């Protein structure tokens, strides 16, 4: 494992060591704390080149200005999964949270045993500032495998903003589902959900969009990932709840496979809890390709004023029905 940066120095954490023929890569060290800016977490080491998972990235250092970025996950070996990204550093006394690290890329053949990209790191939380952005999920290996999920955005406090969720990683070329988008963080303004990753070409689904974060005004749900040639579009994320303002809009559904497959459903709009406010609009359903059903539109969010419903996606050009419109 990589060493941690000294407290008060803002120095980055050390990188994890690479494994040999097989074995897991070493974890990255934590970044050092600092008033002027937290140090970045160290990168995870590469997994053994034949069989081994990448190491996890280190946590970013805390700071009263900006928490350090989490370290990226290590690359998986030939048959190994990518390592998880490190969490972003905490923002203290008005400082903002650091961004989460990206998940590592999966190995070339890892998808054949179900391994894929690493999970993105969570964005750093803040005690009186904006939350950090979640890290992107790692992409799967070149041939096959699932993409890693995006990290959730960090929570912000008081009159600040929750971090946006990280995007899901893309699947391998031939088959594998896209990674789910990370949820938006809580805040005065809720963070937006991350987009779902795109699927492989054959019989795979796009990743679901992340939920919008809860806040005075809700965050927008993430868009669903798109399918390849054969497969289904990912569902759009649900919009965040608005505690004292409007709810967030639902994310749009991903498109279905170009040759065959249904579009993803649009996400439901977030509810608005206070008097006089409006629920979020429902997301639009994803369209199908040549053959398939369009995704249903998302329902509008509840509230004193109902959110507008999303429209259903178009059916296949050769064969397929349009998706149903959402309800108010």
Identify what each model region corresponds to.
Residues 1-328:
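Long, compositionally biased tandem-repeat segments
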